[in-house]
Amino acid sequence: MRLDWCRHLALGALSMICFTPSLAASDLQKDTSLGLAPQDADLYMASYRCREQWEQFLQSKAVREIHQLDYVQKIVAKFKAQWESADGQLAQAKTVLKTPLAQDLIKLATEMASEEMFLFSDGKASQFLVGVNALNEELVEATGDGPEAILEWFESLTREDLNQVPIPTFVLGFKFQDEDRALNLLDQLQAVVSLGLNSNPATVQFAEAFQRVEDARGTRLVLNLHASMLPWDVWEAGSDSKELIQHWEQLLEGRKAAITFGILDKYLILAMSEDAKQLTKLGKQGGSLAQHADLKPVMADPSKPLTGVAYVSDRFAEAEYAAQYQNYFSKIYRQLAPSLALITEEGEIPEFLEALESDLEWLDDEVDQLMPDFKGSLSFSYSTKTGSEGWLFDRTESQWFDGSKRLDILDHVGSNPIMVSAMRRQPGTDWLTLARKVMRKAKGYLEAYLNSDELEEEDAEELAIVMKKGWPLLNRFADVIEQKMAPATRDGQSALVIAAGSLESKQWVKDMPPASSPLPLPEMAMVTGLSDKDLYVQGCAEIYSILDGVVDLVRELNPEAIPEGYSIPRPERKTSGGSEVFLYPIPEDCPVPKDMAPQVMVDARWAIASYSAKQSAELMKMSSSMNAKLQYKDRNLAGASYVDLGAFFKFAKPWLRYAIEMDKGDINTPLSDASDEIPAPTGKDVLDFIQALGSLGKVWATTELDGTGTKTHWRFEE
């Protein structure tokens, strides 16, 4: 099953790096690399106005507080003093940095890091991935048949096979201002590289392929590489496989690539392509990525200050899925087949595993039928007065999220959580059905293994007991999930909630030395939406019964492992405010707060698993505070999340103080030995740093269904 939520978090984090005042969207094609990237680009990532991003980061509250710390000020002062009185190697470095060449390099690097930076590929990147994956699958299959099969595979390759692996164009670029400075540095780079290549007979041919290109779009240095430049004669002389080397020399004849560095319009680029001439077509022929229909959300509001864009094409997303996950299980089998053959003395796959390859191919087909057609994504971000915001459009049909209804579980995440991750999932019955099919096939293999000659007598006896008594328990558990827990939670809503709460103690474990001040513990709960409370309670009770069976099975296999008569303890059952509570009371001699007890609180609509009675009671009540924070105005949501980043550091500080006091006795004691370069930090210095991180901001995100895909909107505020 596709992990949509993880992908949203990853791409959302990528777009969050860009959150400063930037360009109007109407100027994107003219003023940014979106006008340079081809319309068929497979990948595009860009960050705009980088200097302002850095300046805004430095002006954030947490960074300002860190900069003002005594220890940081000491380090800064120490560095300045060392720099001013530099001697030895540091003095030499200081002298080098003052040379005109070094100054020009520093100024150019500053320009490159101040404006715009980007990376994109053309449409051949997906073709390259598809071609490499196809060849890799053939190679893996040949690997399973031994070294001779691998050699035969290499010998069987044709030019048509290699033509399926084109060389894509990748361009890494930076916007700059001073063209004269850049040209001067290109001149010096050309001179140094040419001198180095011509000074060695082995690299003279590379010197001849190293060229300077000047046209209306700029000046660039190009290294043209050809397959003929490879040392075929040397390889033939030192190899026993001359025919294979000659075969590959013929296969690669005419293949070429170019590495380009220099100026293209207002950008300094480093590019790899099949032909350097392809770069001159960028932004001029075939349209630009800014004109692509997938980029319409970026262009929709020209008044917002755009700060970053990340784009993946449908072709590349499909190729990436095929390369990583298509035929996943049969690929693993082919890789492991040689090892499986070592199980028997004859060096062949054991008889009970002969059908494994075909069954794994069946499993691949079943999974493939359940998976959606993978498509690409688009994320982009803007700056705001209080931080930043952005969107992620994932065009792949979601088989996990259900956004058809209001996400009313957000009314039951408390009044002031420090973290919430809520969603509504689809039933997923097709996956449960497939899991049962896999279980039946797995049982067949275990039974065949039991009846084979591969097991020692004692091991066979234990496996026979497991199959006789353990497998029915597994079947019962699957029945409970499919027939009780899944229908009982068909509502599909769930939420992980972490709150500050009131749980604190100077001593959390009896053997733990008491702390000088209370140590807080965040309250954590899992809230689950119920469609049938009675069925849910019955399912939980059945799971306890199954666990008792597991205890009996373990005791039979190893009588000394579990005492006779022991069974899984059942929770106490109470009522509280119209809800039923199933809990395990904390023992009287345990030093933790007495209102702390592992429990599940259940009413007709919700099940709340927690270890805090106060949190369970609060979450069972309705609260609209999260709705106000998310600002989603009762829209139908598939998911929502909220994190107070600084709050986690505030919780960590007392525990870190306790650890330092236990180790050093006093927070003012240095934590390490001082050196001439860096003063040793004390425990207080570390605690002050953690205190500053407590000023980090908050992140909100909501996910909605958008056609067949999903749309996630996130906000970051200090």
Regions picked out by a protein language model, each given a short descriptive name:
Residues M1-A10:
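Bacterial N-terminal signal peptides that target proteins for export
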Residues A10-T20:
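Bacterial N-terminal signal peptides
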Residues A25-M229, V312, F316-E348, E354-E357, ...:
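Structural boundary/hinge residues at secondary-structure and domain interfaces
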Residues A41-M45, F170-F174, T219-L221, I269-M272, ...:
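One face of beta-strands
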Residues V140-L151, R159-P168, L172, L252-L282, ...:
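Charged, amphipathic alpha-helical scaffolding segments
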Residues Q177-I259, K296-V309, L519, V537-Q599, ...:
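Short Gly/Thr-rich strand-loop-strand
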Residues E249-S339, L407, P591-P681:
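A conserved glycine-rich beta-strand in the N-terminal activation segment of trypsin-fold
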Residues P563-E564, P571, G577-D595, L645, ...:
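Interaction-prone hydrophobic/basic patches in short secondary-structure elements
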